[in-house]
Amino acid sequence: MNFPGRDEVWLAALDPVVGSEIRKTRPCLVISPDEANRALRTVIVAPMTTTERPYPTRVRVTFQATQGQVALDQIRAIDRTRLIRKLGKVSAKTAQTVSRTLVEMFTRE
């Protein structure tokens, strides 16, 4: 398997899940840095969804002509064996917006 890269979208099998975690096999955005992706067996991803919610932790995205959101409130580490195949890469603008939103989420004021 190729190492997943930051800002790439991979189809990932997220089941089994518990409670309110986003479930099923779906596109996920890789948000962990490339250095970690090469060194570890796990990857940090944010699931993508076509169900839009007005949450500040959701980033709008158009990927492969489908509109949806990157669910940064659902980020998780998954084993690379859950990754099924690479689907592509988000735009530079979307990648920047995701990075800015993550900084806002984890910065203390």
Residue positions per predicted region:
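Conserved functional hotspots at enzyme active or ligand-binding sites that engage polyanionic ligands
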Residues: M1-E109
